[in-house]
Amino acid sequence: MSSATSNKPLDVLNFGAFTEVVQFLMELDKLKSVYRKNKLLNRERHENTAEHSWQFAVAAMAFAPYVPGVNLERAIKLALVHDIVEIDAGDVLDAGDVLVFDNAAREAIHDEEVKAANRLFNLLPSPQNTEFLALWNEYDAVETLESKYANAIDRAMPMLLNLHNQGQSWVENHIRHEQVVSKCDYIQEILPEFWLQLKQQLEQAHQKGWLL
């Protein structure tokens, strides 16, 4: 094979349905440029949503033994899919952001996320588009054990980062202790023993001034 042939870019139009899959995957690259309120533990920069989704999925694997009956494969799928909509809607809601406690703001943002889900997942060919959208809706509805588990882990992750970086996003956004407890006490339904530990650490963070 000549060097000219070996260096020729792949013509994705020859892939048929793969073309749509590749287009979707390239669209996902934008998640690496969606930055969240939490910074990395070394505080060099804010974490991006792609990093959050990866850490979230690994956390779902790590905590699974403490949640009997949870379907880990499905929980991981929910973790990886749930924030893809931030490509269009952005990230303005996490446990370090005052808007996470504003119900009116949350409703408005949710409408944008629904639009984003429909656009982004329909980049995929059928039936994958339907499957991905169903996963996103399942996470959002918080009715299955897997979606409840995923939501609990998702709420815990920003909290854990704050507890290990001097409450960075809490301090920057003037978050109150009771706000975090109220928003995250849902964790106790899925991981009650872990929530007891977190509550103790939240009280310590409050005493240190990381939470108002």
Residue ranges and their predicted role:
Residues 1-212:
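Alpha-helical, largely C-terminal catalytic domains
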